[in-house]
Amino acid sequence: MRVTELYGKKRPVVSMEFFPPRDDSAAAKFDGIVDKLADRTPDYMTVTFGAGGSNRDGSYQTVKKLVKEKELPSVAYIAGYGLGPDEITTVLDNYKELGVETIFVIRGDKPRDENFAPHPESFDYASDMIGFIKDRYDFTLGCAGYPEGHLEAESLDKDI
């Protein structure tokens, strides 16, 4: 499912966003919630991705559950800050194998862990990661930005 196909229709598009469950108890609740929400026939579900890839397996498992078990159209996030090109490629290869066609690309927040060290080839900007992905994959890509300028930007002019 490519999200862009939905927005050409003359009706509201409804999506629901999920954070990957953090433990078995949350996973059990997640299943019940997804089943109830699926009855509302959302157009697609999105699944977030932890800072610095901190919960990337949880994100993958959640997307896998939505796509393979629940048969729900899903969009996977990828937050590339801290990840190297090989790690991003692995994540995207896994999503491609699941049949995911739309990826939501964000730089992502810096992890709160003061000992966190980003990969030396980490992407500092989502726009750089989008170029990397477009050169290698046929995903439909979405992204988010800061119209007022990013908090870490030197100036709005340089940010734009």
Task: Label each region the model flagged.
Residues 3, 9, 13, 22-45, ...:
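Alpha/beta enzyme core
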Residues 41-81:
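Active-site cofactor/substrate anionic-group-binding motifs, chiefly glycine-
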Residues 16:
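Active-site flanking residues adjacent to catalytic metal/cofactor-binding acidic residues
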